[in-house]
Structures are given as structure tokens and as C-alpha cells.
Amino acid sequence: MKKLFMKPNFFIVGGTKSATTNISYYLNEYSKVFISKLNEPYYYCRFDVPKIFERESMIRDKKKYLDLFNKATNDQAIGEATSVYLHCPHAAAEIKKDNPESKIIIVI
């Protein structure tokens, strides 16, 4: 039975131009991995990003964020890639609060 809301259990973060997007594409080729189609949703640093750097694709609403993972299944590792989580002061704490068992892959 599928859960009502699927949540990511791993995150890919890293420096600018460190290939976080490429890694997410490679991982998504495996049937046991689900990566959100939206690259860099910025959800966990939505309050840390100055207005000047906000993107149209930035997600602030929790339901919209969880909707990114609604096609994932219980037997998949579920992830997302937002490189700037590495630099956002509150991202790691927010990720831990929402997803205490999740893993963070840091690409440098």
C-alpha cells in the first residue's frame, strides 16, 4: 500500500557547478530510485534565500513540495537535489526535523 505522502529520504547538495544535477540524473536511471523532476526546489532554504535570488521554481508550500514525490513508491529511495542546501543556515536542521532518517549526499 502506498503512503499518502511520500517524502524524500536522501538529498543531494553541493557547491556550485559540482555536478549535483548530473548525479541526480544518473541515480534516477535506476528503478529503485526516484528523484523529483523539478531540479532544485529550494524548499528547505526557502526562508534563507534573499528576494533577489529567488527563482520561479522555488517551492514554499509543503503540499506542493510533497507533490514532487507523489509518483514514488514505497520500495524506492526518494531524493531531491538542491545544491544550495549546503550553504543555507537552516536547511540541515529543517531536513532533519521533517526527515530524521534521511541521508545527505554532499558533492564538492
Where are these regions (language model features)?
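PAPS-dependent sulfotransferase catalytic core
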Residues: 1-86, 94-107
